[in-house]
Amino acid sequence: MRIFPLLACCFALSVAAEENFGNLVFSDTFDRKETQKVKDEPGNGWKTSSSWSAKGNKEVDLVDGTMYIYIHPEAIHAVDVGHDFQFIDGTATMRFKFHEAKDTLMLNFADLTLKEVHAGHLCAATFGSKKVTLQDMKTGGMLLKYYDARKAGKLSKEDAEVIKTKVKTIPADISVGEWHSLNVTILGDTMTASVDGKSIGSFSSPGIAHESKQVLRLLVSNKVTLDDVKYYRKK
């Protein structure tokens, strides 16, 4: 078996793919240690929600060169671990591992200066063991007129139908307890998700094309371990 030429070919294809993503603007391999184990201390510019969503309890650990994110029993919101990522078109890549079948990982793109939507939500790709969901939040469920109406129990059937058109759910089979890789690419009004080098699907909607994406928030509903996070800006 001629293994080395095959490995060289795979490496070349990987490099070519990364070059096509654009300029690398952020990366993290989590090869560092925390100074304590009481509060979140992810470092490298990461910000977490635990101070307000989990009464300050720790929800992020750096373990053996990875970032382990887990929700605290007292939490009132999914764990939110965010980092600046300013772009119009770009790609986020990372390795991830689910620990239980119910685990989910959401890549939530946001512009906190945008006041027409709740908490700056623009669009998101959510990965679960059985499905991947692509969503336009800016013109969908997080648009304040919809968000406030739903919260008040006054969302009309017509508006509920509109919101449904802003979400695409795609069946997937992502194993638990094993490492996987993911890519989420945004080009114009289209978001594409891939797992382990295979395209899961794409979704096009106006809110995805928002031209002032500022932050990428990683939201975890239960437990997820991450490594090799990279953000690329194409435009």
Where are these regions (language model features)?
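Short, aromatic/His-centered strand-loop micro-motif at the edge of beta-sheets
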Residues: 142-181
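Short tryptophan-centered beta-strand motifs in secreted/extracellular beta-sheet-rich domains
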Residues: 30, 94, 178-186, 191-193
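Short carbohydrate-recognition loop motifs
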Residues: 56-76
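Beta-strand-rich interaction surfaces with strong enrichment in secreted/lumenal proteins
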Residues: 78-85, 168-174, 216
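Secretory/extracellular carbohydrate-interaction modules
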Residues: 70-152
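Hydrophobic h-region of N-terminal signal peptides that target proteins for export
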Residues: 8-17
